[in-house]
């Protein structure tokens, strides 16, 4: 099928000529050395007139949509919408102040003639006459009574296509929606003690601040946007360069050689590097108990200092690479304290400092050799950050320290529209130091590294003293400046092309026809057919294929294959050394990474979620190794890639290697895989969600993680193209046979095409979601 292109690249990407490898090393030695270079590093744009640089601050952002949360009973805060997303008809929410207002909302499916139904409302069986004459829209009805045992009246109907409803407490009223989508509007009911109204939700719900009411109305009328994970950070592996020592004065310019037009100058300089870290703190929406991200960001700093009686103006940019992600999850309720991710730099991380000053040494840093630097070390100690909770004692992230040690220096170039500034990039390796860091009032304690919460600890800057030496080829006439070599701008132009191409690729997702996509996903796409639509491909087929394979060799998918191969080799050698396969690690451990934890499984949901997530991240490779007749995520990914390549007006042989590699890593980030055991299905996603259910009834059963780990070792692994929630929704609304269920579980392309040709909205919506996840 279409995923043949990825398997072909994995097979052939390790055949590279030595001369090509040497050329690759030479061209990328000082390029793309950090995943987050910032606005003043390598290929960024620097200002023409230097300003004071960025102010190191923390930004708190309240996201628009917080959730989804599970059904629960709680007192929602005033001025926040509860956006309800029910999947089945019936009572979806209840709310009362226990004095004079009892309000509930019921959902009625389409095409219901007037009939009597029994609903359990506030614990009492109530007979209601309901109807919904619409053929394609669902109907929400508010049922209201003013005493606990009084009669019920029906108010404020809402006819909805997206099947969404919302309620909010504001200004001594309960606000809801009424009318008909896509023109639904707000309505309200007056109530006393409105701030004490408890809500009981019987379906998943989201929380949206009243300041974003227009967005809430947009969701009510048009539906929720696709929920996607767009963050993709791949740390690079770096090797420190040896530092070359020179016997020279600290500050001097030496003429090494001279001809009529050119001369070689050796510049030796004492330098003082001052830098600081910057961070971003993003607080989740909702009730104020959750933080989504605490991360490092590039920090610019401009300063002056005196060198041999001369005042020097300098500018630095500090960025980090190879960060470590930590998290804390206090529970799953809206009032449980959660930090989804906070970054920490440790001994496996690197710090980059780009340095430029206004001295003669940086005027002609273009053709350079014999570049070396000696720098002192510096200790960076973290401060404290208070997590300001609405109620209760505040957790505090405090402590942590690392020391920076020089690990090499390279050239970097900063571009503007008018001038090009040539800088030195100093690379520092890290060592962890005392004190350790901890998150008070939680289990996180005695951890080492420097968290991003307060990396400067109140200091204006950190300072490093040292010196550098370089030999530069410059014009003999000191009034001339060395022209910038054309090769310097190659990577910058390519990055600009890639940026424009990524925007075009993401926009093309709206133009893909699903029926054609399924047919294309079934074709065996190889290197030639994948790139046949690109102009001048045939003339440059060999060189372009080689470039694609070289780039793909460094992709996350190729690295995963290498890691898995090593794990399988270790497992095989372990088996030969002992009698008990399970006790010393079997091939199952290579696929799942949890064989050592299987015997000590916690009964908590978070433990099972972590283990299933760990297993699921390996199942993409397992599925590639044991192909089935069903369609998989990589078939869809490759088909979308082929379609976008054919439709693109900006694609070229130069950008193809980066685009193919990015597509293999970033397309469809939210994947789930399943294994089938008789009539039982086990399904797990890389996001930690897991389900076990019966094929014929879709009734959920207990999830046995040990059985799941055994099955993924011995049984075929199948991409959950149509996931469990979609299948259950399809069965509840349309009803499907057991054979149809099996075919959908096996991702049978013939059955998928039938449902799409029948214009089934549930299946089409699921495929559309997968296509929208194919973004760069």
UniProtKB/Swiss-Prot annotation:
<keyword id="KW-1032">Host cell membrane</keyword>
<keyword id="KW-1162">Viral penetration into host cytoplasm</keyword>
<keyword id="KW-1038">Host endoplasmic reticulum</keyword>
<keyword id="KW-1043">Host membrane</keyword>
<dbReference type="GO" id="GO:0019062">
    <property type="term" value="P:virion attachment to host cell"/>
</dbReference>
<feature type="site" description="Cleavage">
    <location>
        <begin position="231"/>
        <end position="232"/>
    </location>
</feature>
<dbReference type="GO" id="GO:0044163">
    <property type="term" value="C:host cytoskeleton"/>
</dbReference>
<dbReference type="Pfam" id="PF17478">
    <property type="entry name" value="VP4_helical"/>
</dbReference>
<dbReference type="InterPro" id="IPR035329">
    <property type="entry name" value="VP4_helical"/>
</dbReference>
<keyword id="KW-1173">Viral penetration via permeabilization of host membrane</keyword>
<feature type="region of interest" description="Spike foot">
    <location>
        <begin position="510"/>
        <end position="776"/>
    </location>
</feature>
<keyword id="KW-0472">Membrane</keyword>
<feature type="region of interest" description="Hydrophobic; possible role in virus entry into host cell">
    <location>
        <begin position="389"/>
        <end position="409"/>
    </location>
</feature>
<dbReference type="GO" id="GO:0044172">
    <property type="term" value="C:host cell endoplasmic reticulum-Golgi intermediate compartment"/>
</dbReference>
<keyword id="KW-1152">Outer capsid protein</keyword>
<feature type="site" description="Cleavage">
    <location>
        <begin position="241"/>
        <end position="242"/>
    </location>
</feature>
<protein>
    <recommendedName>
        <fullName>Outer capsid protein VP4</fullName>
    </recommendedName>
</protein>
<dbReference type="InterPro" id="IPR042546">
    <property type="entry name" value="Rota_A_VP4"/>
</dbReference>
<keyword id="KW-1015">Disulfide bond</keyword>
<feature type="short sequence motif" description="KID motif; interaction with HSPA8">
    <location>
        <begin position="644"/>
        <end position="646"/>
    </location>
</feature>
<keyword id="KW-0175">Coiled coil</keyword>
<feature type="short sequence motif" description="DGE motif; interaction with ITGA2/ITGB1 heterodimer">
    <location>
        <begin position="308"/>
        <end position="310"/>
    </location>
</feature>
<dbReference type="InterPro" id="IPR035330">
    <property type="entry name" value="Rota_VP4_MID"/>
</dbReference>
<dbReference type="InterPro" id="IPR000416">
    <property type="entry name" value="VP4_concanavalin-like"/>
</dbReference>
<feature type="disulfide bond">
    <location>
        <begin position="318"/>
        <end position="380"/>
    </location>
</feature>
<feature type="region of interest" description="DGE motif; interaction with ITGA2/ITGB1 heterodimer">
    <location>
        <begin position="308"/>
        <end position="310"/>
    </location>
</feature>
<feature type="region of interest" description="Spike body and stalk (antigen domain)">
    <location>
        <begin position="248"/>
        <end position="479"/>
    </location>
</feature>
<dbReference type="GO" id="GO:0039624">
    <property type="term" value="C:viral outer capsid"/>
</dbReference>
<dbReference type="Pfam" id="PF00426">
    <property type="entry name" value="VP4_haemagglut"/>
</dbReference>
<dbReference type="GO" id="GO:0044168">
    <property type="term" value="C:host cell rough endoplasmic reticulum"/>
</dbReference>
<keyword id="KW-1037">Host cytoskeleton</keyword>
<dbReference type="GO" id="GO:0016020">
    <property type="term" value="C:membrane"/>
</dbReference>
<dbReference type="GO" id="GO:0020002">
    <property type="term" value="C:host cell plasma membrane"/>
</dbReference>
<keyword id="KW-0946">Virion</keyword>
<keyword id="KW-1160">Virus entry into host cell</keyword>
<keyword id="KW-0348">Hemagglutinin</keyword>
<feature type="coiled-coil region">
    <location>
        <begin position="484"/>
        <end position="511"/>
    </location>
</feature>
<keyword id="KW-0167">Capsid protein</keyword>
<feature type="short sequence motif" description="YGL motif; interaction with ITGA4">
    <location>
        <begin position="448"/>
        <end position="450"/>
    </location>
</feature>
<dbReference type="GO" id="GO:0039665">
    <property type="term" value="P:permeabilization of host organelle membrane involved in viral entry into host cell"/>
</dbReference>
<feature type="region of interest" description="Spike head">
    <location>
        <begin position="65"/>
        <end position="224"/>
    </location>
</feature>
<comment type="similarity">
    <text>Belongs to the rotavirus VP4 family.</text>
</comment>
